[in-house]
Amino acid sequence: MKNFKFLLLFFILDLGYPQTSSIIAPPFFKHQKLLGVWAFESMTTIRDAKRQEITILYKDKKNIETLQFETSGAIKYDVLNDGIEKNGTGTWFADDSHLTIIVESDTTYGTFSIDESILTLVINAEETKKLYGYSTIIKYIRKY
């Protein structure tokens, strides 16, 4: 009789397990929209010199870039800049609209926004004794 009660209890618990586990929602990744592959479209740099200087660079045959943000926190990049190719990996993390990208010994801090399929990164640098301050606005389009 003890074995029957034990088996009955086990059977009831076993029937309830699939029902409860299917109710649990998958974990939510806060920056889901950032994940995937992004292709470079344009870069605008505004330098705060004696006279404000604005430089705009558009994607062309000599300037191609893709970024791939992964859930693991890895970022992969492929860059062709004036015919010079560079690719590799780094680390990224985001907090609200702030984004940090670390590649080798370089760390880039900025803000990001995503509007439909356009990723906009804004990177600001304060003026120092040797360099003028600047703001760079980089736009990417989602590839997949």
Which residues make up each language-model segment?
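Lipid interaction determinants
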Residues: 19-89, 93-144
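Bacterial Sec-dependent N-terminal signal peptides
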Residues: 1-27
